[in-house]
């Protein structure tokens, strides 16, 4: 098992990723974490932002009681903020937010208000930094992901098949489509690291067919 300690190369990884998000000297950067966040990633974020010359501050929340019967992390549905207005205001007033919460803010109820302030938010998945190092953002992914999102948004149906017998017809009419390439430099937006995916959320009842799972 790899140790969770500060490594120079991991500071480099965080700094390079934050630089892709447009973080420069003098920017106000908030590090949002909670009591069950991975400490090494919180420290790496702080050191990387300091290296870039950002003005860094921490917001540390108490991890809420579990509401799911299974381990949950990096879902994007964090409820750690708990509608605390001072926290939302502090994040919305920042230039950049490094999201180190356990689940991430991607689908959090407070995200729209945070983005309205113009903050750029990067959700750092709750993984060992060695995994983040192996999944560094690649600028070549951005145009490919954007092209994939465009195809999803223009498509009416998706067909999924496999040699095992899967044969699914999925209606994409009205589906929400999106994606991420591992960084964001546009104010009022969020992305997540690792990135490099396109996805759609079909409406209820829009999937028909057979899903075969090999034994």
Residue locations for each model-derived region?
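Active-site bordering "gate/hinge" segments
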Residues: 1-215
């Amino acid at each position: 098992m790899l140790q969770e300690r500060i490594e120079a190369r991991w500071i480099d990884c965080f700094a390079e990723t934050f630089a892709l998000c447009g973080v420069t000297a003098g920017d106000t950067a908030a590090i949002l974490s909670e009591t069950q966040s991975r400490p090494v990633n919180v420290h790496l974020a702080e050191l990387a932002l300091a290296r870039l010359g950002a003005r860094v501050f921490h917001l540390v929340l108490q991890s809420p009681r579990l509401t799911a019967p299974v381990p949950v992390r990096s879902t994007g549905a964090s409820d750690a903020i708990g509608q605390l207005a001072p926290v939302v205001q502090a994040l919305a007033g920042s230039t950049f937010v490094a999201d180190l919460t356990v689940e991430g803010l991607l689908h959090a109820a407070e995200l729209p208000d945070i983005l309205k302030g113009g903050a750029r938010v990067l959700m750092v998945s709750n993984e060992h930094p060695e995994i983040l190092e192996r999944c560094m953002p690649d600028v070549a992914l951005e145009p490919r992901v954007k092209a994939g999102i465009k195809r999803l948004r223009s498509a009416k149906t998706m067909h999924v098949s496999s040699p095992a017998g899967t044969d699914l017809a999925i209606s994409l009419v009205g589906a929400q489509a999106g994606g991420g390439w591992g960084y964001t430099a546009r104010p009022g937006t969020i992305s997540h690291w690792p990135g490099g995916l396109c996805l759609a959320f079909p409406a209820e009842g829009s999937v028909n067919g057979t899903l075969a799972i090999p034994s």
